């Protein structure tokens, strides 16, 4: 039987697709401050109705059928409808449109992509309820402490099924041909290795400017320089979400890899720090991060850095020597090195003779160095797999949707789902499974056996400098960073303009966050009350 290897003590907390003002909290609490707990449906109760699933994944017909049929063996009068597609980067806007409708048609979605929506079920209300499909508390079916994805009112809005770890894949053959004998442990060494690769005629890095450089690594390296912001943003005694048993024993230790798992994040304290200038971006630290980024990018990236999203295919074809990516590619790259089916070639849009096998491995994030650095680099260790949120509707429909979610996120439902996934050619799990009691194939266990846990830099505030409150702000802030990387402004000018942007857009941030000025002024006040 499978039990999550990422333990509760070493749980992963992540911002996911939301900004710092959209998802708040920490893992470890047994219940959130949201609506009162409701009774689960009795095991013998027969349900009827329709559940519409519209998560961000695009499962195959076989996977959908396996889960639907397994559920309908227990609940034959329930119709399971799937509104899933390969929406990719369009999913957040698509979901926003669905949630804005007067009569919302979908029931189960990936709510972290619209984290400020106030109509999700507080899943913490069901954490201690007996799951009729496992005959144990739902808490025991799933690692609830992987992340704590909360809305501004403290309601848990999403549960994920897998963990993920981000690092750097590299082509050992190209490293050997260039005479590189040691992996880069520092940012200076990263630049040196890239210089040698470039001199050998190889483009060093395939990286995109959508979710990799301006998101993952913006978070990782902001965290290195700003770990002390924890002392400002963590809940203090008297705050509405302060947990004396948990927060009362917190001791700030920048060398603790899992520090972001050890405190409760209070978004009001973060927003207050931004508004009052206690937390600032026009600093030598921000300028130094950008200076270091400039030493690598766009200089050692592909020419299409700012527009590409397909860096994996470049790495597969040995057009680049290094690829930043997630644990999902441990299986995918292994499979692609072994065999590329006609269907896989068509998916990648490449010819069969475009790929030759090579030796590859991974290395962790090279450390930036200097007097302004406050900690060692962490990774992005967040959630992946399926993201499950439930739309709150009338009581009968809500109970039906939650019942299906409890089935899916337990061995009863996830086993046939996983079996159907592994039956598909080329399936590659994204990371360690977090559903208990599921029999996973030996090859899946082997994929993640050596996966390191470095701590998660995707804490709630680390991505704010390059994302703001999301939407157009993210586009604006990515463009501003590109101006600095392209030498149109200096790193110091960038830091100054960054601070001005955040100040000028405060009102928009407040609106998008779902907070009021009264909330920001008073961390003892629970948002939404």
Where are these regions (language model features)?
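N-terminal secretory signal peptides and thylakoid transit peptides that target proteins
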Residues: 1-19
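C-terminal lobe and pocket-closing loops
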Residues: 45, 331-340, 354, 369-479, ...
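Pocket-flanking alpha-helical
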Residues: 65, 88-125, 137-158, 168-169, ...
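Extracytoplasmic/periplasmic substrate-binding proteins
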Residues: 66-68, 115-116, 202, 284-400, ...
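Extracytoplasmic "Venus flytrap"/periplasmic binding protein-like
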Residues: 70-145, 173-185, 314, 321-322, ...
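Hinge/lid segment of periplasmic solute-binding proteins
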Residues: 112-166, 238-260, 349-364
């Amino acid at each position: 039987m499978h039990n999550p290897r990422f333990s509760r003590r070493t749980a992963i907390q992540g911002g996911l697709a939301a900004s710092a003002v959209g998802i708040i909290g920490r893992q470890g609490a047994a219940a959130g401050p949201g609506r009162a707990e409701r009774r689960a449906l009795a095991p013998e109760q027969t349900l009827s109705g329709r559940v519409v699933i519209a998560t961000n994944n695009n499962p195959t017909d076989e996977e959908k059928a396996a889960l639907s049929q397994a559920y309908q063996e227990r609940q034959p009068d329930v119709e399971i409808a799937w509104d899933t597609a390969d929406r990719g980067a369009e999913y957040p806007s698509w979901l926003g449109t669905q949630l804005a409708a007067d009569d919302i048609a979908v029931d189960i979605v990936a709510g972290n992509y619209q984290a400020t929506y106030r109509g999700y079920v507080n899943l913490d209300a069901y954490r201690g309820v007996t799951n009729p499909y496992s005959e144990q508390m739902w808490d025991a079916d799933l690692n609830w402490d992987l992340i704590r994805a909360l809305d501004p009112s403290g309601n848990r809005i999403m549960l994920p099924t897998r963990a993920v770890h981000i690092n750097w894949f590299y082509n050992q053959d190209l490293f050997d041909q260039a005479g590189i004998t040691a992996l880069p442990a520092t940012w200076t060494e990263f630049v040196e290795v890239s210089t040698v690769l470039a001199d050998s005629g190889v483009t060093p890095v395939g990286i995109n400017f959508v979710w990799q450089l301006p998101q993952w690594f913006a978070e990782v390296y902001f965290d290195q320089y700003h770990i002390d912001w924890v002392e400002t943003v963590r809940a203090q005694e008297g705050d509405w979400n302060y947990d004396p048993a948990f927060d009362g024993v917190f001791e700030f230790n920048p060398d603790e890899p899992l520090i972001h798992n050890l405190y409760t994040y209070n978004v009001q304290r973060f927003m207050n720090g931004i508004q009052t200038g206690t937390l600032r971006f026009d600093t030598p630290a921000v300028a130094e991060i950008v200076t270091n980024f400039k030493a690598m990018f766009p200089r050692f990236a592909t020419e299409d850095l700012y527009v590409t999203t397909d860096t994996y295919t470049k790495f597969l074809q040995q057009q680049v020597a290094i690829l930043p990516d997630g644990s999902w590619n441990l299986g995918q790259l292994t499979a692609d090195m072994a065999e590329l089916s006609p269907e896989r070639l068509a998916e990648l849009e490449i010819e069969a003779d475009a790929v030759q096998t090579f030796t590859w491995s991974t290395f962790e994030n090279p450390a930036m160095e200097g007097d302004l650095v406050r900690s060692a680099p962490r990774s992005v260790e967040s959630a992946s797999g399926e993201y499950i949120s439930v739309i709150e509707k009338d009581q009968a429909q809500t109970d039906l949707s939650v019942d299906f979610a409890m089935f899916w996120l337990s061995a009863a439902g996830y086993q046939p789902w996983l079996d159907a996934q592994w039956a598909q050619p080329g399936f590659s799990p994204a990371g360690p499974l977090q559903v208990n009691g599921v029999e996973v194939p030996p090859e899946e266990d082997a994929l993640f056996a050596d996966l390191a846990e470095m701590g998660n830099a995707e804490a709630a505030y680390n991505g704010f400098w390059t994302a703001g409150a999301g939407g157009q702000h993210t586009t604006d802030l990515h463009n501003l960073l590109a101006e600095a990387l392209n030498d149109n402004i200096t790193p110091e000018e960038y830091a100054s303009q960054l601070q001005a942007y955040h100040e000028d857009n405060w009102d928009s941030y407040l609106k998008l966050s779902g907070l009021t000025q009264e909330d920001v002024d008073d961390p003892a006040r629970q948002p939404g009350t």
